Each structure stands twice: as C-alpha cells, then as structure tokens.
Amino acid sequence: MPARILVHGHRGARARLAENTLEAFQYAINCGADAIEMDLVLTGDGQVVVSHDPVLEAGPEPRLDDVFLLARMGSFVYDLEIKWHSPEQPDTFVEFVLGKIREWRLEARVSIFSFDFRVLGIMRKFAPEIRLTALTETGARAFNEVAKEAANAETVAPEFHLVTRQKVEAAHAAALQVVPWTVNAPRDWDAMLAAGVDGIITDDPAALIAHLEARGLR
C-alpha cells in the first residue's frame, strides 16, 4: 500500500455541494483534498468552461480561468477531464486547454483525464511534460495495456469495480499509478486500500480523509 493515499475530490465535492462549482472546489481544497477533479467542455465561442454536460444550459458554470485562480489556495493538483463527444478530432479543444495551462504556468500541477484516448495522444504530442490519466469503465484488460493504448499515460483511472489487487500490482510493476472512481462507501474505500491503489476519486473528500486518518493513513 502506498505510504499516502491521495484523495481526489470528484467534481469538487458533489456529495456536499453543487458539482463543478467554485464553492465545491474551495470546499475540497479546504478539507485537504490532494486533487480536485472537474469536467471541461468547449463553448461555441471558444471558452473552456467547467461542466459535465456537453450542451450548456444558462447557468453559473465557471470558466477554467476562474478555477485556476484557486491555485494560490494550496499545492493541490487539477484533474482536468476533457470531455469529447464527436467523431471529429479534438485538436482545437486540446489546444485551448493547453493554452490556459501554459498561461497560468500550471504544467506541473495538472493531470489530463479522458475516456477518448485521442485527447491524450494530442496532449502528449504538444506537451509531453504534462501527466496523462486514462479513464476506463469496461473490460478486463490489464491496466498497463490501457495505459499503453492511451499515449503511455502515467495513471489509469478505472471504474472501481474493475480494480483487483493483481491488476494494481501489475500496474505498479510497470511504474503506473491506479486511481479508481467514483468510490463513496467506506466498505469500498477499504476494498480499494486492500488492493493497493495510489489514490481514490470520491464525491465526499472530507469523509474519505477522516476515514484514512482513522486508519493512520493520513
């Protein structure tokens, strides 16, 4: 088991506050999350905004710039999921996101997540220094095979029911990290800990941190 299990706040802390909002991200940061996870979409006028839905409703979706302003609150990592729902190549979207990362000089504090491995391949091409995380939710493939397909991503983020100790050990042997999603029940946290994962993505980072502290893992 890693010496420190990293806590990733899913969409901030959606068990406590409205997801993908500045308030949820601030809450997760203040409670001690190591990373805040968020979904990114591209608007028709070229704005990168934080939203789970590809079609935006009128509402207070924060811009990526707004969320990057929170960087001064700590040394946490930004888990940026680039959501792409088109057969077209995502080059433009990736370039917009990378431009913002460079503008804010946050290359060392972001990890790019995606289910669409084209996104990860483009990011790897233009910014090889930025960490990549391959999201996966189906299949029995070894995590190192998933990472290889995903532009040699450094981290694999599987749906947590896919996690086994054997898969995690094989991933670690290949110098990969495993960070499952979205894990919210204490019994499932314990199962992930027993499997040896490196971090956990959860809707309730405060509760997970308390759970880890009670077990001397924080």
Question: What would you call each of these model-derived segments?
Answer:
Residues 1-218:
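Phosphate-group recognition and catalysis centered on beta-loop-alpha active-site segments
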